[in-house]
Amino acid sequence: MQVVFTKKAPPQWLLDMWKEIDDKTFGQGFDCFAEDAVCNLGVSDWKGREAIRANLKAFIDTGFTAMHHVTEYWDAGSLKVFRGVVDMTPDDPSMTTVHPTMTHFFYMDETDDTKVRHWVGAVGPVTFG
């Protein structure tokens, strides 16, 4: 199977999701996920939109603020690829902000192509000090 990617501006659903994380609100921006979506970030294996939302919130609540930056976005229809950088600023002022690279694959739902069915991503390395 051959897949053709087109470089595009990031879609609003992606920007809205990152904004929810950056603002620590975890609200409607997560509606881009199918109700039974799966998320594999690093070693995570979260099943369901609400589990994705809750686990990301728990991770962010460990003591830092994130700010996501989109470097590039590629669209191949049912597969979307995003690359960027996230600024991770610790709540503890004695610790240094880090800027790990991110790469994410979003596999869209077969019956509703406005929803993410499977999110696979990597961020890092992430080390504070």
Language model regions located:
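A beta-strand edge to alpha-helix "cap/lid" segment located at domain peripheries
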Residues: 1-4, 16, 54-129
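A short gly/proline-enriched turn/hairpin at secondary-structure junctions
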Residues: 36-47, 59-62
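Short, well-structured alpha-helical segments
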Residues: 30, 49, 53-56
